[in-house]
Design a protein with these regions (language model features):
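Beta-propeller fold recognition
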Residues: 1-219
């Protein structure tokens, strides 16, 4: 994949008037009260965004989405002061990741993630569940890109608390061959989440994941 000059932005608009409220775009960090710039926002965003309410007041204040470069983004839009709204990089799981090179790491996110408020022994977190796959080529059986199903633990759950974590593939525990096939307890480090490799040639995720009572379903 290559960087995109279109589609690499997030817009918040007034539903009644269509007026711009706030947007996040690629740039050097200048911006204004209604424009936030992030230098890493270089890939298009083809899906809708997952929305969350971090403080339970009935208003959306957290957005999460993936892009076609394998990045996962978090937008904090808490409160009426848009100059405090921000976009942060939660994870880099594709061609922009540390040590990534070639088509094998050209992972793309075409579908909205599932955002699930959760808790473990380390405290509260938002589970960001997402899967990679090149949707424009669903019948590709070449298997040249290694796709995954992911669950990322975003522990910055307080309103406006997002930071550029930039989690990498290796930060997520690999559950492909040592957790799902065994009845014994999983010993993989799941502090930041997990990754499940899709091992069949051309295998990819082609829909938004669905989480029900602790179980995740991928298509």
């Amino acid at each position: 994949g290559t960087d995109d000059s279109e589609g690499n932005a997030i817009f918040v608009v007034n539903a009644e008037t269509g007026d711009l409220v706030w947007k996040a775009v690629q740039g050097g960090g200048g911006g204004s009260a209604t424009v936030f710039e992030h230098p890493r926002l270089t890939d298009s965003i083809p899906s809708t965004l997952a929305a969350g309410d971090t403080d339970g007041d009935g208003f959306t204040d957290r957005l999460v989405v993936g892009d076609t470069g394998g990045n996962v983004w978090r937008a904090d839009i808490h409160g009426p002061d848009t100059s405090r709204w921000k976009l942060t990089l939660l994870a880099s799981l594709g061609r922009h990741g540390t040590g990534a090179s070639g088509i094998a790491t050209d992972r793309r996110f075409f579908h909205r993630p599932d955002l699930v408020p959760s808790k473990d022994g380390d405290g509260m977190f938002d589970a960001v569940v997402i899967g990679s796959g090149n949707r424009p080529d669903p019948l590709d059986m070449g298997g040249m890109t290694t796709n995954f199903a992911f669950m990322i633990k975003d522990r910055h759950v307080a309103p406006g608390s997002g930071v550029n974590e930039n989690l990498q593939l290796g930060d997520l525990g690999d559950v492909t061959s040592n957790c799902l096939q065994s009845d014994s307890p999983c010993t993989v480090d799941l502090t930041d989440g997990w990754r499940l490799m899709l091992t069949e040639p051309g295998e990819k995720v082609l829909a938004t994941p669905l989480t029900i009572t602790g179980k995740v379903f991928f298509t």
